């Protein structure tokens, strides 16, 4: 009669085999952890860390893009690269899909793609040209407010 293993030992053995399979073939699993800043760390071997954020010595290491954070749809939508892109030309079949309401009330003039000039910014992801005018006057530091004329 064969000896049977208890349930907890077989579960531990199964988890250990899965981990061994995962470490030998890292593309079949997801043992990738991310911290709060969106950097993804993988540590498969001794050389993999030199290709990750924080270990590389490149000039664009800290440049921020809207692809840094997962699900960052708000910044992706209002990014200058997306706003400045011109709308596609109307299709020859577009009039079939227009509603009466759309033709009556949504008469939008085409916006120019040159309406945004790049302004000085504080960090790579900052887009001050999208700020409304009432907020542009608040770009003074506390030092400037303390030592300027009243």
Swiss-Prot record:
Keywords: Cell projection, Cilium, Cytoplasm, Cytoskeleton, Flagellum, Nucleus. One of its GO terms (cellular component) is nucleoplasm. Residues 99-110 are annotated as: Mn 1. InterPro entries: CFAP68, CFAP68/107. The keyword Nucleus applies. PANTHER family: CILIA- AND FLAGELLA-ASSOCIATED PROTEIN 107-RELATED, EXPRESSED SEQUENCE EH456644. Microtubule inner protein (MIP) part of the dynein-decorated doublet microtubules (DMTs) in cilia axoneme, which is required for motile cilia beating. This is Cilia- and flagella-associated protein 68. The lineage of its organism: Eukaryota, Metazoa, Chordata, Craniata, Vertebrata.
């Amino acid at each position: 009669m064969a000896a049977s293993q208890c349930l907890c030992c077989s579960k531990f053995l199964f988890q250990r085999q899965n981990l061994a399979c995962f470490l030998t073939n890292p593309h079949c699993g997801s043992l990738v952890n991310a911290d709060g800043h969106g950097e993804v760390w993988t540590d498969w071997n001794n050389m993999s860390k030199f290709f990750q954020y924080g270990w590389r010595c490149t000039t664009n290491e800290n440049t921020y893009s809207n692809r840094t954070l997962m699900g960052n749809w708000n910044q992706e939508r209002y990014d200058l690269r997306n706003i400045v892109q011109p709308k596609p030309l109307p299709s020859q079949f577009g009039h079939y899909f227009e509603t009466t309401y759309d033709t009556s009330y949504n008469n939008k003039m085409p916006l120019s793609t040159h309406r945004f000039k790049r302004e000085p910014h504080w960090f790579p992801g900052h887009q001050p040209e999208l700020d409304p005018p009432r907020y542009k006057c608040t770009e003074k530091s506390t030092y400037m407010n303390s030592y300027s004329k009243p």
